[in-house]
Curated annotation (Swiss-Prot):
Biased composition (Polar residues): 447-470, 542-551, 574-585
GO CC terms, sorted: cell division site; cell tip; cytosol; nucleus
Keyword flag Phosphoprotein: yes
Species of origin: Schizosaccharomyces pombe (strain 972 / ATCC 24843)
Functional description taken from the UniProt entry: Ubiquitin C-terminal hydrolase involved in regulating actin dynamics and/or endocytosis at cell tips and septa.
Name of the protein in question: Probable ubiquitin carboxyl-terminal hydrolase 9
Amino acid sequence: MSLLRWMGMNSPGSTDRRKSTWEAELPKPSIRPETLTDRFYGLTNYGNTCYVSSVLVSLYHLKPFRDSLNSYPLPSAPPNFKSVCTKTNHPESSSSRHSKKKSMENRKSSLYGSNGINSCGCVDISNVGSESGTKHQIVVGESNCSAYGMKENIYTCLKDLYCSVSCCDCRYGICSPERFIQVLRRDNEAFRSTQQQDAHEFFNFLLNSVTETLDEYYGNHSDVMHPKWVHSLFEGTLTSETKCLTCENITSRDESFLDLSIDIENHTSVTSCLRSFSASEMLSSKNKFHCDVCKSLQEAEKRMKIKKLPKILSLHLKRFKYNETQEGHDKLFYTIVFTNEMRLFTTTEDAENAERMYYLSSVIVHVGGGPHRGHYVSIVRTKTYGWVLFDDENVTPVNENYLQRFFGDQPGQATAYVLFYTAADEEDDDVSEVDTKESIKPMSIPSQLKQESVEVSNLSSTPRSNSTITYPDMDPMVASFSSQYSHKTLDRDINSRSYFDREPSLDAERFHSRSVDASPKAVRRESRSFFPSLTRKRSKFFGSSQSNSPKDSPLRDTHKSSDEHSESKHSHTLPWQFSRSRSKR
């Protein structure tokens, strides 16, 4: 039996017969059952809310944070998630359904050919197991705050959002955090604007809101022990040591932190930036230190060290610098190298777990030239599929080398902005065994799939890359296909999507509707006004080869007719990637 026939994509009447969920059609991942708790849900963008999505996705995939949020406080009654987790069916007329079906057939024909294989060797099975016109979507609506004994606030909405995804039977789909966005804008004036906001500022606001809500709740319930799990996970202790150069007395002062904001320099690494963070500072002249032993102002040496290491280390790279001339912030496109493993050496002598090893868990990437424009995406390490890119509704597996594109040394405007490192001794056992303790090596494809995999690779026009990394416990189907996945189209897609967030009055859907109605010349004129940097550089995104030919410009790929745009947008669709389709107006 061929691979395509086994998957039900090349057999007669395969589109008409009733199918079970598409997961049943795939080989089971070669991992233990408890690791199947991963959920891969993209979040709907409600107009420049990608800064929210990137933070929520990153925190959700930090298992200690997600589990603590779902567990505290325990509901007095089982929360009613029926109104929260639903499958949405969009009724359509027969003519509209026929038109969309024909358009989809034309699109798949150009993407996958007659055998269902695209040029990258990826099989399109994103709709396997779903009924016609139906995609799994979670709409988080009415709050279950009464079950938690709280008033509706950011914390209860976040708890509803995470619980609805965790409790959902389907592992893949789209989540619409509508109520969370409404309450966020209701309770905080800074986030009511449709302008792009800073993801790090939102992260700090979210942690503070969660902490304040829990303090208030457990303050009113003195009979229940306050777990203080936010501080338990993120809190560390900094020690400011000041050494008098006259008597050599050392004065120490401790302060807590939930994240570290570090200054950056060009052509350095995160470890080097942390060393600079703890570098010595001379206190002299007008900045002399008052020594309690000398009883006078003395020259002194001051430095910051880490006394207590957090379980989850959040690092904020300070890429935005205030420009007094322009009275605004400029982005620093410095090259900052970060690694999957890191150990901090800027600790005090009496520090707890001074030799603690950290592993990279999530990266929030900013695409754009300033803090209030551009786009945010997140890349997280998962137990099942390794590294996964979350770009609003789009969910795509990527290999480990893909992270190197965000060091800041590539053409384009995408750079790592916030890094989340998890301590090795705090990681879940199955995560440690899969992603950290074992070296990443090519997985062995089961014998019954070897011949079929060879056939798929022969059909592909793109040769298999020898540098592609597959994960030892990745789903065999995804491993065999993602190894041939082209990141160039993904890079260009992120680049083009980021510019939809530059102008608050112009969202992606309105842009597409205007592009369809306009003539090609009008579209190009409008493109130059909204994409000035791309028009000047005419370069591929993330370090692709530059071209001087206008026909190779990303603009030629970005602004097409409706059907052509959909083709380019979904040309890199992987088996379980979901994205919201946009309708014409």
